């Protein structure tokens, strides 16, 4: 093989630059690299007693150098494909026009904020630890997901501002929208139990009452609600925080945003599959390397921006300045080129929360109504135990949490 191929999209261009510090070129050429391949020390069991992590053992797949070379090569190939267009053509509405940082350009190299990369489906073993109380570990259970796209970045303040303008103009999600019609014969995510199959039903209009602005009554409703939760990344007017991930958004608003933007909330199985690297079942989205405290792999432990925070912190950050612009941890690149799958803000998912897995699971979701919904990925305040793709938290869907954000998924 010749010299390292150049990356063909901004996300992977930046990833290739960052990973060059740990010999990404050698990985592409098939030469094993200890950082990409993992080693016995780094592949030790994840400490589940860390802050916001549960107890129990964690078995992780050993990433070989060859697998990692394929991963980076695949990321380049996937990133070279066009980002999805919404129905009728054009980019997703949150990134339409020339909105500048946080709207049309994200990350240090100015990627399209709406880049959405293909996650190639497959089967993996689900074994989660859960929070916020910790201590619960579910037994292993297989799950299969079909191909889907997962956005490269968490939703930014700038992108959400476009959504606020749309709701101010009267937009609300249509009844039944947000269903993953690409799976299960067009019926969407399913749950099989006691001889019956239940399918997702999409947006319920009664949920609009749980949004900040249910009737398009004015942008001021959003300002009041989003700023009640502190520290909030939202500002009433555009400013220096447009590239920060939006936090303090509740589940209903997260779901509505993704519908408006031409996508949907990923299921718990889909999100976990992407974060674990599919069948590789990585310890962290990037592999087995310890994330350290220099904000290169993940924004966590109140370490941002100077790396001088408190490892395994339990929520001592008190300012939006402790939350990083999306894409600020370049070595945290997931198998399919997503960034910030661990840390910064946790990501709200479609499923209701349950201690038991949906089984069997083929494009499944927990559809039995409950008082909480699943969130995954850890946040800027968590300890290292919550950076695993297996970690899950749960929150009431109307709750605003300063650690919580959203990332959308899309049809392949």
Segments predicted by a language model, with ranges:
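Residues within well-ordered beta-strands of beta-sheet-rich folds
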Residues: 149-151, 159-161, 255, 260, ...
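Extracellular secreted precursors and ectodomains with disulfide-bonded cysteine-rich loops/domains
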Residues: 23, 93, 104, 111-112, ...
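Short, structured beta-strand segments at or near domain termini in extracellular proteins/domains
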Residues: 401-412
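Functional-site microenvironments in short loops/helix caps that host divalent-cation chemistry
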Residues: 118-119, 125, 200, 204, ...
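Sec-dependent bacterial lipoprotein signal peptides
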Residues: 1-23
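Ser/Thr-rich, Pro/Gly/Ala-heavy low-complexity intrinsically disordered linkers and tails
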Residues: 23-105, 133
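A short glycine-rich, aromatic-capped structural motif
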Residues: 107-225, 229-230, 248-250, 343
């Amino acid at each position: 093989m010749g010299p390292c191929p150049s990356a063909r999209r901004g996300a992977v261009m930046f990833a290739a630059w960052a990973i060059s510090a740990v010999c990404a070129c050698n990985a592409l050429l098939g030469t094993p690299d200890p950082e990409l391949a993992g080693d016995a020390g780094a592949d030790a069991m994840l400490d589940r007693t860390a802050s916001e992590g549960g107890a129990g053992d964690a078995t992780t797949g050993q990433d070989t150098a060859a697998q990692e070379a394929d991963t980076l090569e695949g990321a380049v190939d996937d990133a070279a494909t066009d980002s999805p267009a919404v129905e009728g053509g054009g980019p997703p509405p949150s990134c339409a026009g020339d909105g500048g940082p946080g709207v049309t350009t994200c990350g240090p190299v100015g990627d399209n904020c709406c880049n959405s990369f293909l996650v190639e489906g497959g089967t993996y073993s689900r074994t989660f630890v859960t929070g916020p109380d910790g201590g619960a570990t579910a037994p292993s259970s297989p799950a299969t997901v079909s191909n889907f796209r997962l956005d490269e970045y968490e939703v930014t303040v700038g992108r959400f501002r476009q959504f606020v303008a749309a709701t101010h103009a009267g937009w609300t999600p249509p009844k039944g929208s947000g269903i993953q019609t690409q799976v299960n014969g067009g019926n969407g995510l399913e749950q099989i139990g006691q001889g019956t199959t239940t399918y997702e039903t999409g947006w319920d209009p009664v949920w609009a009452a749980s949004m900040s602005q249910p009737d398009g009554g004015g942008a001021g409703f959003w300002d009041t609600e989003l700023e009640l939760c502190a520290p909030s990344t939202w500002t009433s007017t555009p400013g220096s925080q447009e590239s920060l991930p939006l936090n303090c958004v509740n589940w209903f608003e997260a779901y509505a945003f993704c519908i408006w933007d031409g996508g949907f909330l990923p299921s718990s199985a889909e999100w976990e599959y992407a974060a674990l690297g599919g069948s590789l079942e990585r310890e962290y989205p990037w592999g087995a390397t310890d994330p350290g405290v220099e904000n290169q792999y993940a924004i966590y432990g109140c370490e941002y921006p100077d790396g001088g925070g408190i490892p395994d912190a339990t929520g001592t950050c008190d300012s939006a300045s402790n939350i990083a612009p999306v894409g600020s941890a370049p070595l945290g690149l997931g198998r399919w080129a997503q960034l910030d799958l661990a840390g910064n803000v946790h990501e709200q998912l479609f499923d209701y929360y349950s201690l038991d897995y949906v089984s069997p699971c083929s494009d499944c979701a927990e559809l039995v109504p409950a008082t909480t919904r699943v969130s995954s990925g850890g946040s800027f305040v968590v300890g290292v135990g919550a950076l695993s793709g297996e970690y899950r938290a749960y929150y009431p869907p109307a709750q605003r949490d300063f650690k919580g954000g959203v990332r959308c998924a899309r049809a392949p």
